[in-house]
């Protein structure tokens, strides 16, 4: 998308907007764009602030240029709907409302365009209503880029499922790391399997080669991905792209993180704090306590600053610090080395599965996956698969029977059961169109009172 943006800037006089769902990704893109323009030797930039805008998708009514939707509402005088008032339909409903208002205006008068080109990154996060809204306000072209596998169990958009062009090679991370991370996300070593493509061409479409062989157990698929020489100055054979650990308690998890950093500092003399990202997957306070502990040790032992991005209002990545985050702030970011820590049991947790796939594919060189006490079974199932991938470049997977693949209704049930209390409260209130901060607080107090009365009785 950056290459396309530069071409549009150089070859046209049009107004261009680059958008995505995540605030931290939008801020990261703003910081990376000037460096990319330098690399592409773009010298004429006097009108760049007028012609190129980078913003997240939603935004704020008080800051119209903070988001594409808020910009559109301000430009055309539409009713702005914030998150609290969005109801059960969320951003999809917000976009549908804006579309309806624009259609009314279009019927009464000519509707001017506010952009010539819109570039949408991480498009798998959006439904088709957002794409239609962008088309209505764009004179020339809406360009959509997505990773269809960042949602391993559902798709929001028909447009994203039917792309004009497909890039089935992965350049950011090693193909072996990608295959391991995706197969862990798909649950291919478990029963039931979360995702399986019935048509062989769908595996090929996704960049996989495979051979089949019959065994007593059933039909075995031997998957592989084409190796890619991503770095001219690094011998890729010296790099282990994926490492997995099982640690039964937080003490040993912290110890393992420090051992990894020690090893990286020893092997890479020019390593900087910003080369390392640490992400924990936990729906409880245990993850934040662990992150505080890791942050303190890093700052004391290495004299490196850390950035716990979830504590910051503006969520902009700082290049001089070790990045530490929960699962909510890693989309679109890239690191030389990524350390993922999984505290929650993920066997039945599809959201966490999705997060693990996403965070594990953030690394240029190596991703480290540390599994906590509740995931010993996952470690035992996937450690042998990783060893096979690293040694042979292949993964042998038994084709599951139809009864061993999760069906749509089962997936919906699992998604619902994996929600936190706060998420369940939010969903319930949105379903009743009663979502507000006051109602959230009231419902929490009510639940707390009911639990207390139950204990007393």
Feature roles, as predicted:
Residues 1-457:
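The feature marks helicase ATPase cores and/or their adjacent C-terminal helical subdomains
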């Amino acid at each position: 998308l950056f290459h396309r943006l530069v071409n549009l800037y150089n070859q046209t006089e049009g107004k261009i907007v680059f958008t995505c769902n995540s605030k931290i990704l939008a801020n990261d893109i703003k910081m990376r764009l000037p460096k990319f323009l330098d690399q592409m030797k773009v010298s004429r930039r006097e009108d760049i602030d007028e012609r190129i805008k980078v913003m997240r998708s939603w935004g704020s009514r008080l800051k119209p240029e903070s988001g594409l939707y808020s910009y559109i509402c301000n430009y055309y005088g539409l009713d702005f709907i914030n998150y609290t008032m969005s109801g059960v339909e969320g951003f999809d409903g917000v976009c549908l409302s804006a579309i309806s208002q624009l259609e009314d205006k279009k019927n009464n008068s000519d509707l001017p365009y506010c952009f010539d080109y819109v570039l949408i990154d991480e498009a798998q996060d959006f439904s088709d209503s957002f794409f239609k809204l962008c088309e209505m306000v764009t004179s020339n072209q809406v360009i959509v880029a997505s990773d269809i596998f960042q949602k391993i169990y559902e798709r929001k958009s028909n447009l994203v499922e039917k792309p004009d062009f497909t890039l089935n090679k992965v350049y950011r991370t090693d193909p072996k790391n990608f295959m391991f991370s995706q197969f862990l996300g798909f649950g291919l070593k478990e029963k039931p399997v979360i995702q399986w493509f019935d048509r062989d061409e769908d595996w090929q479409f996704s960049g996989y080669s495979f051979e089949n062989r019959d065994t007593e157990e059933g039909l075995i698929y031997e998957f592989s991905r084409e190796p890619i020489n991503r770095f001219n100055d690094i011998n890729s054979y010296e790099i282990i792209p994926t490492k997995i650990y099982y640690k039964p308690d937080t003490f040993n998890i912290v110890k393992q993180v420090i051992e990894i950093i020690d090893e990286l500092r020893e092997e890479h003399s020019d390593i900087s704090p910003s080369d390392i990202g640490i992400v924990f997957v936990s729906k409880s306070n245990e993850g934040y306590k662990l992150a505080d502990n890791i942050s303190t040790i890093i700052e004391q032992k290495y004299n490196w600053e850390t950035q716990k991005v979830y504590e910051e209002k503006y969520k902009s990545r700082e290049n001089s610090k070790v990045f530490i985050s929960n699962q909510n702030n890693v989309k679109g970011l890239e690191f030389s080395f990524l350390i993922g820590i999984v505290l929650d049991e993920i066997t039945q947790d599809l959201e966490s599965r999705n997060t693990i796939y996403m965070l594990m594919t953030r690394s240029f060189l190596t991703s480290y996956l540390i599994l906590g006490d509740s995931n010993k079974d996952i470690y035992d199932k996937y450690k042998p698969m990783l060893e096979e991938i690293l040694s042979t470049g292949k993964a042998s997977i038994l084709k599951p029977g139809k009864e061993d693949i999760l069906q749509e209704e089962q997936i919906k049930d699992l998604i619902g059961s994996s929600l936190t209390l706060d998420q369940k409260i939010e969903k319930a209130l949105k379903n009743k169109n009663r979502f507000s901060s006051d109602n959230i607080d009231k419902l929490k107090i009510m639940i707390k009172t009911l639990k207390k009365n139950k204990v007393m009785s």
